Amino acid sequence: MGAIDSGNTAWILTSASLVFLMTPGVAFFYGGMVRAKAVLNMLMLEAAALSVTMIIWTLWGWSIAYAGSDIGGIFGDPASGFLLKDSMVAQDGVFTATGLNGNNYPVSVDVAFQVAFAMITVGLICGAIAERVKYSTWMIFVALWVTFDYAPMAHMVWNGGLLSADGAISKAIGAAAHDFAGGTVVHINAAVAALIIVL
């Protein structure tokens, strides 16, 4: 393992912290848009989105999106990074980050940054289902959506899959697709899911 770049690590952790703050911000925004009796429900839906997404991302979501071998350009091998395998190791009772990504910051830092985007993406969908869904149904939806929609889309766009700049579709049409700010994975993905839910 090479040397950790402390500047890159600090910047990614700062960025992850700021993105984490977006989810409660969206919760309060959506809470202000619903009737007074539905504010608590909206806040709880956002809290469920945050909690379930973090659990799914830790178990297998990150692995589907970023770890291991590519399966048809659609998703990564869910078992290759199950439970963030090989990104942290316990040494003398202390968890230590192992492995560096291409920018010399720990993989575990990248996991934190990416889960923040996964959480805000699910949180954006909440506005479409205000006062329309039971809490338990929403939790099941979040688990399934992160597993079968968000993580594969993140893989396809951000990890060299079908829709990436180097992907098969870009090569077939002769024009590279670039998604630097998350327009496809975050905004289009959440908008289409919200539209499908309300229809």
Model regions: which residues?
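Hydrophobic alpha-helical transmembrane bundles of multi-pass membrane proteins
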Residues: 1-199
